[in-house]
Amino acid sequence: MDRQPKVYSDPDNGFFFLDVPMPDDGQGGQQTATTAAGGAFGVGGGHSVPYVRIMNGVSGIQIGNHNAMSIASCWSPSYTDRRRRSYPKTATNAAADRVAAAVSAANAAVNAAAAAAAAGGGGGANLLAAAVTCANQRGCCGGNGGHSLPPTRMPKTNATAAAAPAVAGASNAKSDNNHANATSGAGSAAATPAATTPAATAVENRRPSPSPSTASTAPCDEGSSPRHHRPSHVSVGTQATPSTPIPIPAPRCSTGQQQQQPQAKKLKPAKADPLLYAATMPPPASVTTAAAAAVAPESESSPAASAPPAAAAMATGGDDEDQSSFSFVSDDVLGEFEDLRIAGLPVRDEMRPPTPTMTVIPVSRPFRAGRDSGRDALFDDAVESVRCYCHGILGNSRFCALVNEKCSEPAKERMARIRRYAADVTRCGPLALYTAIVSSANRLIQTDPSCDLDLAECYVETASKRNAVPLSAFYRDCDRLRDAVAAFFKTYGMVVDAMAQRITERVGPALGRGLYSTVVMMDRCGNSFQGREETPISVFARVAAALAVECEVDGGVSYKILSSKPVDAAQAFDAFLSALCSFAIIPSPRVLAYAGFGGSNPIFDAVSYRAQFYSAESTINGTLHDICDMVTNGLSVSVSAADLGGDIVASLHILGQQCKALRPYARFKTVLRIYFDIWSVDALKIFSFILDVGREYEGLMAFAVNTPRIFWDRYLDSSGDKMWLMFARREAAALCGLDLKSFRNVYEKMERDGRSAITVSPWWAVCQLDACVARGNTAVVFPHNVKSMIPENIGRPAVCGPGVSVVSGGFVGCTPIHELCINLENCVLEGAAVESSVDVVLGLGCRFSFKALESLVRDAVVLGNLLIDMTVRTNAYGAGKLLTLYRDLHIGVVGFHAVMNRLGQKFADMESYDLNQRIAEFIYYTAVRASVDLCMAGADPFPKFPKSLYAAGRFYPDLFDDDERGPRRMTKEFLEKLREDVVKHGIRNASFITGCSADEAANLAGTTPGFWPRRDNVFLEQTPLMMTPTKDQMLDECVRSVKIEPHRLHEEDLSCLGENRPVELPVLNSRLRQISKESATVAVRRGRSAPFYDDSDDEDEVACSETGWTVSTDAVIKMCVDRQPFVDHAQSLPVAIGFGGSSVELARHLRRGNALGLSVGVYKCSMPPSVNYR
């Protein structure tokens, strides 16, 4: 039988499908297809149909009966799918045996054709060569740092034939018969002589444009995208002739299934993909005759030779088990390749069959509870894949790496085009809207800062089917949620929908925040499941429901402490949702991403890790493995250099390369912080590492160095006779964890005894320290200034908060850190002054309400304890056991500088100093009062309470002298009552307030970081989105690292050097939206120099343009010292060295910080690139 193959492809989804009808006996002509990715598959006959779906360079192969199976469930699985996904069985044992027999017969025919080709010098079986690559070279199919598989785990080209059976077997629910069939098919391809494959020829690509009626009325399954969805099609069977393409019969199905299928629609055949090269070369007549003669003796004796010929075509859609060919396509559109070429010449068919029809077959999309790293992470339910809107390929993001769109149209026309895309996104799809927003956001915001909100609302429209169902229905049928949370949405569905609609109508779908905040909410905190994306209001509704359910678990204790005094879960949900949507309380991104879901996903952001064993072998094999596991799962880790073991530089390189490899796949912003001691010889190696190769891991690794007070005393010694000794690692361990007096005595004794050490000048050590700090990734800690409510003899927890590593002590294992921030900007109330003891009026018609601040702090204490209970229940990494010992809270503050601007004050005004100290004192005592009230309502104190200083009625400010503490602003009656209640009832938490910068929470809420000055009026911040590098960037990378002559490189060489990079979006000073457009634009364009131009008569405009580059560092340090008695965790002190400064100023700041009793001298240093820091 002379039949022609048909090739169908979907360029967006990156796969092609080949249908070769064969006779029932499986002895017909053989076809072999090879892919450029290295995959090969053989084609059998009978009821088998082969196909290949290209994903990340991996060929998925399947041969078998496809009556009840779609390509979507059989294609090459993603990285984690190979290990975890299970597919339904699709063929009975009898059908599998029949397919195996057909494949065996096909293999025999291939061997005979190969022998004939060897005897006849070519010819033999027809060959179809198809070279397939993805249009997106980087970003979707495993190119240089794409969104799917890491390149190191992709199969090699020369081993794909061996890897194909494993892939095929994995996609059939561990079926041995199917695995054997796939193995036989791969063997057929391997047996084909490679010399007979002709050269590939390019084919033009022209995608069909569906008619308006078809595009608007095409049925869509639950998980498909409106833009990329096109129904599957199956063509009506007709007689196949050499001049007519072979028809594709419809899949066999039952009568009931046929009744459920909608009316078939016509599909216009698509042109070929330009990246698919196909060529066939028919054998010459002489070769064909010779080949037939060579196999004639075997053909005469074979049963196939005497058997009658099979029917040319069979009726479609029937139940006949003897169909001659069968194909099954997924719900994605499959265009037809009609421009095949033979020997480089196009094939033209004069007579073409009718346009093939379409049959819609619903296929459920895979869903995931959260987009994590896209790799084999520890938690299986954290890495489920989603289909990108670009190509329909499974990955860890909604869009592949962005190819920057270059456009020279004016900003006004560009914004109008974005609005048109947003209004028509249902019909046209979100890809064009996403590309236009991300490519032009920086330019548009700098031109007109007021368009930041418009871009944010347009970006929300990129979510798939966000308004298809009510919000409660979105969650109540989701099996990824905890049963209690899903039951909450079923019980209070109408209440949830009404509250969400009320908030959305009042502040908009982006909740009144800018573009960066919206992108982080949707692509870092939002999840994809059941074919839909979470929007900001959906994320907060899920988190609020999880917190409301958790309140029911503790027996209603939390109801008594919340400021709104709820009586049931619905009212608690309303209180939490209002606080979250107004960004009054800002949880960490991990809480927003995973709260409410089942499984063991960690909802804490960072851990302080100490190895359980200290031998060299267990440390190298265990510690590094554990750290890499936690970093891979998106956790920031703080670890001591002494615990790494082995060569410290080699360990740092290993960890740095791991962080660097994860950057293109990371969902959360993670930092690996290494803390070390300046009295250890490891300090010399780490200093050299930071100064030499530290920039390679910028933003990925950070460092913190412990500097004792004796070190600074020797640095300030005017005689210059005092030297500094750096001891060996084993000797230096004896100095860890000692107080000031003990450390000085032991150090001087080791110095007199002549212990093995390296002697350096203190001045040289400080110069090295300044150079490392100036890099911006090194913090300086004063361990002897750290105070704690826990005596040292019972173990000390992490006291430096989420931003800074552990200073000393701590417990073996993982100590989790929850970061929870309150927004002071929500406490500024508009209106006339109110004469009250809880309000402070500072002008411009606004007042800062301490009553509102009290409500925020009490709600934050309750919310923090609920998060601790969630962590204890899941106990990820065993962190719950350590967390129960002290139940440390890490309540941070954001928006202080924004409050000063709204009140018409500058950062360094005298009123600002007073308000700074009063806010810090009020927050601490209010948090202690709320924690005590929890115990009075029925909760238990933390287990170590009897051995803490709280049991004696002491608080953290009591550890400071009166001169250090300053005047008390809380009443004496309040403090006496609080001490009495603590001694009698206990306290729920051991620590409360942290002085972290909270940059991510501040950017999410659109306010200023911590108690610190604003970074800038407009600055770029990394997002979870990825962008392919431009040609100039790749060329720069080539010249800088590879040292190759640029003029000798081609573009394909450059594409192998660049890697995908995070997209940076602008973060705008929200106060600029409140002033005139002209003044805001001028402030943005002037950049860091804007505050120096005080030419405006409007005080509000002058205050809004103030940034950290113009605020005096002395004012920042003074405020930090004033807050120190009320911040029981360390404060992450930033230092900005402006133009004209030098690193010499750093030493002065460090000396002052040590003398003033700060626990952290410098957390992060910001310096312009022109400053000389060495």
Curated annotation (Swiss-Prot):
Swiss-Prot/TrEMBL site (Cleavage) positions: Y277, A278
Example of a GO MF term: ribonucleoside-diphosphate reductase activity, thioredoxin disulfide as acceptor
Location of the protein in the cell: Virion; Host cytoplasm
Database matches in InterPro entries: HSV_RIR1_betahv, RHIM, RNR_lg_C, RNR_lsu_N, Rrm1
Single GO BP term: symbiont-mediated suppression of host NF-kappaB cascade
Pfam families xref list: RHIM (PF12721), Ribonuc_red_lgC (PF02867), Ribonuc_red_lgN (PF00317)
GO cellular component: host cell cytoplasm; virion component
Keyword terms, alphabetized: Host cytoplasm, Host-virus interaction, Inhibition of host NF-kappa-B by virus, Late protein, Virion
Biased composition (Low complexity): 182-202, 233-243, 291-316
Main localisation: virion
Chain positions covered by the region annotation Disordered: 170-269, 291-325
Post-translational note: Undergoes proteolytic cleavage, generating two peptides, a N-terminal and a 116 kDa. The N-terminal peptide retains RIPK1- and RIPK3-binding activity as well as cell death suppression activity.
Positions occupied by motif RIP homotypic interaction motif (RHIM): 50-72
Cystines in this chain: none
HAMAP family on file: HSV_RIR1_betahv
General function of this protein: Provides optimal viral replication conditions by promoting host cell survival and avoiding the host inflammatory response linked to NF-kappa-B activation. Blocks RIPK1 ubiquitination, thereby preventing NF-kappa-B activation and virally induced inflammatory response. Prevents host necroptosis by targeting RIPK3 thereby preventing the formation of necroptotic RIPK1-RIPK3 complexes. Also inhibits ZBP1-induced necroptosis. Does not have ribonucleotide reductase activity. Betaherpesviruses probably use another strategy to expand the dNTP pool in a quiescent host cell.
Annotated domain remarks: The N-terminal region drives rapid self-assembly into homo-oligomeric amyloid fibrils and interacts with the RHIMs of host kinases RIPK1 and RIPK3, and ZBP1 to form heteromeric amyloid fibrils.
Subunit organization: Self-assembles into homo-oligomeric amyloid fibrils. Interacts with host RIPK1 (via RIP homotypic interaction motif); this interaction inhibits RIPK1 ubiquitination thereby preventing effective activation of host NF-kappa-B. Interacts with host RIPK3 (via RIP homotypic interaction motif); this interaction disrupts RIPK3-RIPK1 interactions characteristic of TNF-alpha induced necroptosis, thereby suppressing this death pathway.
Descriptive protein name: Ribonucleoside-diphosphate reductase large subunit-like protein
Organism: Murid herpesvirus 1 (strain Smith) (MuHV-1)
